[in-house]
Amino acid sequence: SLSASQQAKYPHLKDAAAFALPSGKDLKPLLKGELVAIGTDADGILQGATLVQSAGALDALYSEAATKLTYGAIVEGGNVTFRLWAPTAKSVKLALFDEQHNAIGERAMTQDEASGSWSVQGGSDLVGKYYRYDIQVYHPVSRKLESYQVTDPYSLSLAMNSEFSQVVDLDDPALKPEGWDSLKAPHSQKNPADITIYEAHVRDLTGNDESTPVEHRGKFLGLTDSDSVPVTHLKSLAKSGVSHLHLLPVFDIATVNEDPAKVANIGDDFSKLCEVNAEVKNSKFASHCGGGETI
């Protein structure tokens, strides 16, 4: 049966049967591929099989060392250290790109057996460059070893549409807003009962506001226009006792194209919608694509 500590961590499994591998078995290489638990009868005839869920094993084997490390593109002491936690990966390479996102090189990364992380170090010339990780990893859906090029889950900066991660130094004065180092929170965060929250949608807050510059509407930049009607309203709320502004959604939305050249909005020619969305040309709206109408 599971130990007391295991039952506490996985209470939904406390009544399940527990099995153990032979002592001395190196589990880490096994977690890089397909793991199947099988049951046989006394004659060794297969009676059943199931795929193994490895999340608990990964935590047990790697978490102590892994949680002591810093991840991402770390700028420190004139060097840039790239570190990614990918214990199940067969191999990881750092793929580098210039400002136009042209490939400029690739560097092999080394895995740390204790933490399961992969890392490689470069010079300060990499600050400002874009990068991705080339990963070879077993995928449980395809049940094959797959190759992927992915952005860094620990990214501090990303290119348009989050297609490339970027190396940035957050201590660089050029990246700090004026007065950033002396900025202090206007309200204490210690007692949640003293917090009064106003919730707002990033787009809706300024999206249709005529006092906000067109190029800032519906964007974070809309909050920087101190004399606009929405921001003036927020200031009045602050004077009335509102202490915190909760913006949402602030995560990356893959279905929203950030490239203005590939976006069609209300008021644009319908033909532009046909250009940016090929499916429209194959729909019942196809006849409108060359009619000079607006959306």
Task: Identify the residue ranges that each predicted region occupies.
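Short, solvent-exposed loop/turn and secondary-structure capping segments
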Residues: 94-97, 132-134, 142-150, 208-213, ...
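Surface-exposed loop/edge segments in extracytoplasmic proteins
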Residues: 5, 101-108
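Short proline/glycine-enriched turn/loop motifs at strand-loop junctions of beta-rich domains
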Residues: 85-91
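Aromatic- and acidic-residue-enriched carbohydrate-binding clefts of CAZyme catalytic domains
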Residues: 211-225, 257-295
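Extended low-complexity, serine/threonine- and proline-enriched intrinsically disordered segments
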Residues: 1-2, 92-96
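Catalytic domains of carbohydrate-active enzymes, especially glycoside hydrolases
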Residues: 231-250
